[in-house]
Amino acid sequence: MLMMVIRIYIHKRLNAKDYNNFYTSIGDFGYTIPGSDAPQYNIESDSEHYLNFGIAHINFNNGTNNQITNPNPEVYTRFYIQMKTPDGQDRIVYEAENANAISFLIRSTYHKPMSGLVGGFRFDPLLGIRVYKDSFVLADELARIQSEFTTVYGNSGINVTENTTNYSVRMYWESAVVVEPGEPSPENPIPWLSNLPNITDGNPENIDGQWGNVTGFNYNPTTKLFNADVIYDGNSYPIRDAVVASNDDSFLTRTEKAYYFTQGGQKFLYLNFSKDIDSFMFKNHYSELKNWVGHALWNLSTGEVNVMEQLKVFQYLKFTEDNELMAYFYIVDTPVDDLISVTSNVAYRYWKPTWFGLGPKEPGPIQNKIITAAQGEFNSIRPTWVKPVYLGSYFAGASGLVIAGSALIKGGSPWFGLGLAGVGILAGGILQYADDNEWLNYDIAQVQKLEPNVNIRSEISEAYFNAYGQMFPSTLGQSLYRISYGQFDQSDLQVISDKSDVITVVFETDGITHTYQKDQIDDTWDGPATEIPLGVDGILPEWALWLITIVIGLFALSNLQKIFDTIKKKPIISIIVVIAILYALTYFNLL
């Protein structure tokens, strides 16, 4: 049985001529269904019944209450408000079922650089730029379905509007439409499933498109049978006695609002655990998403159910020998087919050596670095052995020059010293040039899938157990990833776990891309990189170093004359000592 869809559109009514669109008397203030005695809406100028709020604007600064009455509740069972998006798509911003009336409060604010009102209307008789903002608060007569949305738009000059599609809306009541699925047969054992429409526009990849609206939501926890209607493009498609295969059916009892979509040839129900309009992760732009509390995706084609609440992310971090911060990255209790990207705020500090590396290391200030690791991208890692080697070569070269100079002063041969200097300076120069041009660097994938072998499992199992009170899963497939957060300039680093955050996670499961933001992520940072580095206590305690310093100082004071005589008689040795001190300061990052 197929019934034709019937819609009744609600038109905007003003008490002054609205630039030849439509008008009525002041007694018809607000919104109402046009009657036979009222001027008809100009269908030819806007066949889609969208109402342009910016052409004539009424002063509603203090708000005005309006009510739209259902002309026939037995026929018109759904009420919709749609708004044009910037790309011209139709987007539902409010909907209600089985309502006799819809009440809403509208507040309008108006800003312009010039003053003056004309007849109580926000018309600017002079050319100027103005900005309008309309806020709608809507509810049905029982306050069962409440929502709020805002339109913002600009105007320049008389009767010249900008970005019309950003604030044009339409409102309508819609009648029920039924497309019967037929009876089961050997060729079509689940007729309601094959009867469901293939939607090409509204889905998680195109959130502003038209989704299927799920109404008549009915689940029996005893029989585990689910019934509902999918409303799409003026038709109603029944879901009849769908069997819930999951042992945990709480996702259905928690569902507040549902939508239908198709993707990759499969049919899905998107079951949201809140009915607030800004709580739908897949139907909101992320700048609009505020109150997400969780949802479930029910693949009607396969029966698989994927429940997603606050995303739990476990990271086991450590620094490699080349100061690369890497993490074993695992999303807990959530299937992941493909990790696309991770963006994190890494808080860290550097433990600075003292007393030429002999004393205890001191913690530096906490610094922050925003890092994104993306699939298909690589980090270039500079081997840390290169810098000490070319600094050592330069030291050897400088020492060779000192030896050659000393030999010349004494009348000996300088060739050994010159040879040592040449080799040292040449080797150091070549290594430094290669290092500066990253010739010795190697690439590490920023996101890399891992098979969790015994070594990895034994390494992270204790930290995982401490975080979640359970053993690390034995069958992870490709859900475990190695994340490279890049190379840091210094060693002896510590990641400050309680000040670090995973900001964004993007992954794909069953062909659907999921994006989680900071407030939706419960992240755990663990591993050796989050601990105080080894050896921070130093080789000697601080009191011993002070004692040694005092002894050396007293010895130097008592032998100042001998020291000055040595510098005069043997300047070469003094130069070597100075070079050694400078090298040590550089090596320990004290210069």
From Swiss-Prot:
It is a multi-pass membrane protein. Coiled coil: none annotated. Keywords: Membrane, Transmembrane, Transmembrane helix. It comes from the Viruses. One of its GO terms (cellular component) is membrane. The chain crosses the membrane at residues 389-409, 411-431, 538-558, 571-591. Its main location: membrane. It is found in: Membrane. This is Uncharacterized 66.6 kDa protein. It comes from Acholeplasma phage L2.
